[in-house]
């Protein structure tokens, strides 16, 4: 039976009812592959529907991909479903820090056989692929690669004679000048996503303490209570209390706060490459007011600027999946050039698969110059081992949860930086003993 275009599109929002038997379902002679996705705005949902679900379903006649957008609750829903032996065939997590728990619990399949069949290990950047290797086995593919960046309103910079900052002194000079003009230095808000806290702390830990010290701490060679990390937390508190992140951090959403920069109400934003995927920011337009750069040093540990190695999401196959071959076929489809170009054109930054062979022609096919140059520079830095470490990729789960929640207590003067880091070290030590710290990529030669 050949499905019509309408039938294929209809498969996108198909409900995946709780408690369905685990036997693989079939529709129209095809074996169904189920996939739950987290948050996606209207542009993202359209890209998922057109560039992934429909495109995969028309590319072959053996499997039928059904995807359901679950929203912010997806992590909890997945956790419950996996414990019950139900849930989707394709398991997406919010990064290796989240993958560790389900891999250790045996809730996802090793992908080594599929990796050998499809030559995945030869096609992905090792620094990203290795973040999903536990006990010598590959449990996930990285869906994307990300980094924190400094986005800024280039028109506002020009009007005020501000130059690209190269160090902490430069950044703080711009911040103070902005405050004097009634401009928010950094557009920021976590009303709809507490994870903004860890975006900022990724920058402070790496750009103050330095990536070498962060690596040592993640390896257990240096405690989180060491002075470089105290200085990082103290600087984050100082900036928050000076008003560098505005007066409405807890009431503004991510989009509202970034639009402050676009509209000239704020000068800069510390955000990630995923920001390219929000069309309201207008960064794909030739006349965009926005520009972007890597984040400059904020301490004495290094000079210059730094990108931060991140895998924003991982893709695994559930242990109880009755259609692992179909799920692997979806992964293989995601590695096609057409998918890379169309998905990154329609939803930039959300599906920048960390493939080794990222040709200039592929990037030009996206048609988004600012995104293309940023991704190309990231690809180069990650290939050469020149990067810091993001919390959502390399911190273990409980430690990272406390990092996010506890830092607000520091900023609001309820606990000291020392108390915050002492608690973090306690949690980290316990998780390290339990083997829950995500693997680190090898040091660059």
Q: What positions do the PLM features span?
A:
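Glycine-centered hinge/linker elements that transmit conformational signals in sensory
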Residues: 176, 218-249, 295
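Short helix-initiation/N-cap motifs at beta->coil->alpha
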Residues: 69-77, 168-170, 249-262
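A structural signal for short loop-to-beta-strand junctions that line the ligand-binding cleft
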Residues: 88-89, 118-155, 184-188, 302-308, ...
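Short, solvent-exposed loop/beta-turn-alpha elements that line the ligand-binding surface or hinge
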Residues: 112-124, 190, 207-231, 281-285, ...
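Hinge/lid segment of periplasmic solute-binding proteins
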Residues: 94-149, 172, 178, 197-201, ...
């Amino acid at each position: 039976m050949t499905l019509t275009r309408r039938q294929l599109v209809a498969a996108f929002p198909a409900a995946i009812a709780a408690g369905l038997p685990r036997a693989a379902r079939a529709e129209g002679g095809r074996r169904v592959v189920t996939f739950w996705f987290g948050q996606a705005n209207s542009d993202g949902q359209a890209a998922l529907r057109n560039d992934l679900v429909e495109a995969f379903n028309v590319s072959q006649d053996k499997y039928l991909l059904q995807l359901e957008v679950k929203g912010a609750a997806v992590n909890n829903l997945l956790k419950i479903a996996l414990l019950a032996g139900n849930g989707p065939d394709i398991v997406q997590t919010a990064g290796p820090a989240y993958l560790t728990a389900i891999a250790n619990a045996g809730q996802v399949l090793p992908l080594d056989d599929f990796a050998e069949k499809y030559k995945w290990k030869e096609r992905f950047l090792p620094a990203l692929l290795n973040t999903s290797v536990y006990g010598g086995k590959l449990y996930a593919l990285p869906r994307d690669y990300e980094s924190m960046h400094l986005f800024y309103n280039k028109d506002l910079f020009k009007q005020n004679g501000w130059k690209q900052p190269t160090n902490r002194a430069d950044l703080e000079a711009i911040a103070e000048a902005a405050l004097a003009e009634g401009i928010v230095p950094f557009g920021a808000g976590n009303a709809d996503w507490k994870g903004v806290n860890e975006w900022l702390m990724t920058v402070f830990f790496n750009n103050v303490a330095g990536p070498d010290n962060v690596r040592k701490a993640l390896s257990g060679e240096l405690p989180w209570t060491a002075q470089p990390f105290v200085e990082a937390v103290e600087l984050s508190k100082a900036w928050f209390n000076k008003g560098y992140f505005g007066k409405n951090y807890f009431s503004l959403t991510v989009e509202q706060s970034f639009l402050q920069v676009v509209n000239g109400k704020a000068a800069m934003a510390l955000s990630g490459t995923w920001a390219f995927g929000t069309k309201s920011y207008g960064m794909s337009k030739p006349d965009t007011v926005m520009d972007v750069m890597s984040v400059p040093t904020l301490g004495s540990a290094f000079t210059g600027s730094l990108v931060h190695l991140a895998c924003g999401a991982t893709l695994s196959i559930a242990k109880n999946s009755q259609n692992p071959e179909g799920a692997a076929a979806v992964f293989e489809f995601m590695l096609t050039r057409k998918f890379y170009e169309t998905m990154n054109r329609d939803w930039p930054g959300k599906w920048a698969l960390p493939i080794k062979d990222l040709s200039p022609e592929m990037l030009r096919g996206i048609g988004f110059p600012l995104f293309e140059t940023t991704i190309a520079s990231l690809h180069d830095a990650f290939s050469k081992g020149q990067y810091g470490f993001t919390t959502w990729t390399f911190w273990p789960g409980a430690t990272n949860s406390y990092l996010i929640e506890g830092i607000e207590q520091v900023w609001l003067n309820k606990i000291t930086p020392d108390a915050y880091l002492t608690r973090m070290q306690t949690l980290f030590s316990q998780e390290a003993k339990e083997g829950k710290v995500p693997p680190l990529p090898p040091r660059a030669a």
